[in-house]
Swiss-Prot record:
Belongs to the heat shock protein 70 family. Keywords: ATP-binding, Cytoplasm, Nucleotide-binding, Phosphoprotein. RAC is a heterodimer of the Hsp70/DnaK-type chaperone SSZ1 and the Hsp40/DnaJ-type chaperone ZUO1. RAC associates with ribosomes via ZUO1. Present with 73600 molecules/cell in log phase SD medium. This is Ribosome-associated complex subunit SSZ1. The lineage of its organism: Eukaryota, Fungi, Dikarya, Ascomycota, Saccharomycotina. Residues 464-484 are annotated as: Disordered. InterPro entries: ATPase_NBD (IPR043129), HSP70_peptide-bd_sf (IPR029047), Hsp_70_fam (IPR013126). One of its GO terms (cellular component) is cytosol.
Length: 538
């Protein structure tokens, strides 16, 4: 059996592994503890090493030997890293100019680990889990990275993987991997603009991606390194701490172990409220010997964390603006990351974005119900795509001249019977490209006008229906005219005429648009019955 190429998503908070099984389907691999979203954490007790969920459990009793939130430190000098991200676990120290950790291994022995070594150990655990599941050695992987990862960080990741016998054959950016996995399961029926919003544990990332003929083009990216699921945990911690303090006059924030207990249980409560309308929290001896038992419903949780949810929505708005697009230019928002399970995230985006924008999250039947597995699945699909390439062929296929293709700045399309513009090739379509459309109703002499198009957003104010003069007097004190409604609509207009083609006595027409690698446009119109064709070039 040949060694499969696996897909790995390595996040600050959690990691996932996937591969293409013998039936040619994507399998997301669970570790020996049954975790598919495997916490990116390592913990040490004496000579024993714990990984994943077992390591996270050590945060309460053994925080100084538990390493968390370390992914973003790879390949960066110590002074460029925000080491406060791992403050709840082992404190970061400078080791050889890099982020490192000093771990107690018992009997007075200490071990200094650079972040490179920590990454190697984490990837090795993922590799072993994959080998155990697949039943054969794993030597190669496609690894996802954020769009803002530097070449130095990628090089360091490759080196850490190579140390444990794992070759990174390709990096794929996280939003493209997630969108690839979504489109494999739920194909887009037309060209679309999609925001991929990844809300993780300690950071949020987003990208606006134009999907044209199956090709992805990133139009803009955004990153907020201080916004994530931990912000929701913090709001719950503060709420529960205040309630506990009111009841017992004891402050659980003052004791590190009490605070760690509260954080761990708040995170569990947050996850429970993603699937249920209420949750209970129960902590033995939270502070000053007092036990804490309480319940919270989803509505209260959403009110407590309302400001954070508003920040998530604003973050999506910001990346759309960065792409110099209007929300009406967006067809869908694909939610990924652990926060995506939270229903309030979806409802907020549905409220702030136009109705035409589909929110593709776990609550949508047209989207994956496991958004935190999308990127790993996409990496596995990319691994399948490149598995037949050798190293030289893959390097050739990834040359900038091939990957960085030119794109249309304006849409190209046809003029309708009433002088309206119908786009065929949308803006941001990469070329070379070919697109066909069939007009079966075209009869007789037929003139085809090919134009560039422009689009704009038109706003109309709809005045409310005024109150009737003879309205019931009882209603008068409570009734008032509604506010005017502003309706926004995306409209196309004709731009520059590119060419005209005429067909006589047509009986249905097929029109083929071709743009070559140099940007030359050829349009062919063919009579469906006779096969006669006319061509125009520009």
């Amino acid at each position: 059996m040949s060694s499969p190429v696996i897909g790995i998503t390595f996040g600050n908070t959690s990691s996932s592994i996937a591969y293409i099984n013998p039936k040619n389907d994507v399998d997301v691999i669970a570790n020996p503890d049954g975790e598919r979203a495997i916490p990116s954490a390592l913990s040490y007790v004496g000579e024993d090493e714990y990984h994943g969920g077992q390591a996270l459990q050590q945060l309460i009793r053994n925080p100084k030997n538990t390493i968390i939130n370390f992914r973003d430190f790879i390949g960066l000098p110590f002074d460029k890293c925000d080491v406060s991200k791992c403050a709840n676990g082992a404190p970061a120290v400078e080791v050889d100019g890099k982020v490192g950790f000093v771990i107690s291994r018992g009997e007075g022995k200490e071990e200094k680990l650079t972040v490179d070594e920590v990454v190697s150990r984490h990837l090795n655990r993922l590799k072993l889990a994959a080998e155990d599941y697949i039943g054969s050695a794993v030597k190669e992987a496609v690894l996802t990275v954020p769009t803002n990862f530097s070449e130095e960080q990628k090089t360091a990741l490759k080196a850490s993987a190579a140390k444990i016998g794992l070759q990174i054959v390709q990096f794929i950016n996280e939003p493209s991997a997630a969108l690839l996995a979504h489109a494999e399961q739920f194909p887009f029926e037309k060209d679309v603009n999609v925001v991929v919003a990844d809300f993780g544990g300690i950071r949020s990332d987003a990208a606006v991606i134009a999907v044209r003929n199956g090709i992805f083009t990133i139009l803009a990216t955004a990153h907020d390194l201080s916004l994530g699921g931990d912000n929701l945990d913090t709001e719950l911690v503060e709420y529960f701490a205040s309630e506990f303090q009111k009841k017992y006059q004891a402050n659980p924030r003052k004791n590190a172990r009490s605070l760690a207990k509260l954080k761990a249980n708040s995170s569990i409560t947050k996850k429970t409220l993603s699937n249920a309308t209420s949750a209970t929290i129960s902590i033995d001896s939270l502070a000053d010997g007092f036990d804490y038992h309480a319940s919270i419903n989803r509505m209260r949780y959403e009110l407590v964390a309302n400001k954070v949810f508003a920040q998530f929505s604003s973050f999506v708005d910001s990346v759309i603006a960065k792409a110099e697009l209007d929300p009406l230019d967006i067809d869908a928002v694909l939610l990924t990351g652990g926060v995506s399970f939270t229903p309030k995230l979806t409802t907020n985006l549905e409220y702030t974005l136009p109705e035409s924008v589909e929110i593709l999250g776990p609550q949508n039947k047209n989207a994956s119900n496991n958004p935190n597995e999308l990127a790993a699945s996409g990496a596995a699909l990319q691994a399948r795509l490149i598995s037949d390439y050798d190293a030289d062929e893959l390097a050739e296929a990834l040359q900038p001249v091939i990957v960085n293709t030119p794109h249309l700045k304006k849409p190209i399309g046809l003029i309708g019977a009433k002088g309206e513009f119908h786009p065929v090739l949308l803006a941001e379509t990469s070329f070379p490209v070919q697109k066909k459309l069939t007009l079966k109703q075209a009869k007789g002499d037929f003139l085809i006008g090919v134009y560039e198009g422009d689009h704009h957003i038109e706003e109309k104010t709809l005045e409310p229906i005024p109150k009737e003069e003879n309205a019931e007097e009882d209603d008068e004190s409570e009734w008032s005219d509604d506010e005017p409604e502003v309706v926004r609509e995306k409209l196309y207009t004709l731009g520059t005429k590119l060419m005209e083609l005429g067909i006589k006595n047509a009986n249905g027409v097929e029109i083929i648009f071709n743009i070559n690698k140099d940007g030359a446009l050829r349009v062919t119109a063919r009579d469906l019955k006779t096969g006669n064709a006319v061509k125009g070039e520009l």
